[in-house]
């Protein structure tokens, strides 16, 4: 930071003038809670991902946890370190009063885009992607958090689809009792666990269900249930057993198929209790296709 910007930052209470510090290189991608930019850090010349959170929507979300000392999205993201989790460089407040997060820029497709396009790049890479996603989610849980929005949209792949990284901790909360009370229904409806939809107490096993739905779609190019844009379709999650994954992907390794279906058990007690159990269950699987 230059000396002029340093003193200006002090006068602004440590807030950052985004326009002065970052050059926007690519138009914003608007999300539900934020805008995302490809930017150049004028101080370091580094190309970064710049996420600016919508002030009103962020305040409304955080109001649900008023008095609980919930860490911000930036604080959570910065505390996580894993090869399959996006790197967060810095975070703070803009001079306009908006939270911002600076992270590595991932110049690859979202997993959701590859699924929508039924990309051939996924062939032969699915098992590796499943393991990386599972390890990333395990790292989030081991750090003491629940992600609460595991879905293909929140995994960004490399251009060759051999690796991926977990992103977006906007709905993530500490895995503590006060943050897991019924009534806090958040996430992407198509991937919601039954206990979330039905407003029951939740824990990290809701992520395991959403992970299972995402992996199912990775192989089937279909969800285990009817797709819907709101919570009404999600009410059907867990009411009947998902079709066997082999109906859509006949070559799937049976051990992997059973592990995915166990993630999708309606009752949390019948799922894997942590991601380590899932990884252990598939440790001997060598290829996504049965030999």
Would you name each region that the model predicts?
Residues 57-79:
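AlphaC helix of the eukaryotic protein kinase fold
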Residues 90-92:
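A short, aromatic-enriched beta-strand patch in the conserved N-lobe beta-sheet
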Residues 96-110:
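Conserved short submotifs of the Hanks-type protein kinase catalytic core
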Residues 111-121:
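AlphaC helix of the protein kinase catalytic domain
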Residues 129-130:
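Activation segment signature within eukaryotic-like protein kinase domains
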Residues 135-145:
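Protein kinase catalytic-loop region centered on the HRD/HxD motif
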């Amino acid at each position: 930071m230059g000396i002029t910007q340093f003193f200006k930052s002090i006068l602004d209470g440590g807030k950052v003038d985004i326009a002065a510090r970052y050059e926007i290189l690519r138009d914003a991608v608007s999300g539900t809670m934020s805008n995302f930019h490809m930017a150049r850090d004028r101080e370091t010349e580094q190309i970064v991902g710049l996420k600016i959170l919508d002030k009103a929507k962020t305040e409304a979300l955080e109001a649900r946890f008023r008095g609980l000392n919930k860490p911000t999205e930036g604080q959570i993201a910065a505390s996580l370190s894993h090869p399959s989790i996006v790197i967060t460089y810095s975070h703070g407040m803009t001079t306009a009063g908006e939270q911002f997060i600076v992270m590595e820029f991932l110049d690859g497709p979202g997993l959701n885009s590859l699924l929508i396009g039924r990309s051939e790049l996924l062939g032969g890479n699915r098992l590796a992607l499943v393991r990386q996603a599972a390890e990333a989610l395990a790292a989030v849980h081991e750090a003491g958090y629940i992600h609460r929005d595991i879905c293909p949209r929140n995994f960004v792949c490399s251009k060759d689809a051999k690796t991926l990284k977990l992103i977006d901790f906007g709905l993530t909360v500490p895995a503590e009792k006060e943050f897991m009370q019924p009534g806090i229904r958040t996430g992407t409806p198509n991937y919601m666990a039954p206990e979330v939809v039905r407003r029951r107490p939740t824990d990290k096993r809701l992520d395991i269900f959403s992970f299972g739905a995402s992996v199912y779609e990775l192989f089937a190019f279909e969800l285990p249930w009817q797709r819907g844009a709101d919570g009404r379709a999600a009410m059907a999650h867990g009411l009947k057993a998902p079709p066997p994954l082999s109906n859509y992907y006949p070559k799937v390794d049976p051990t992997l198929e059973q592990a995915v279906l166990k993630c999708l058990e309606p009752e949390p007690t019948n799922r894997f209790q942590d991601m380590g159990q899932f990884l252990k269950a598939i440790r001997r699987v060598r290829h996504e296709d049965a030999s």
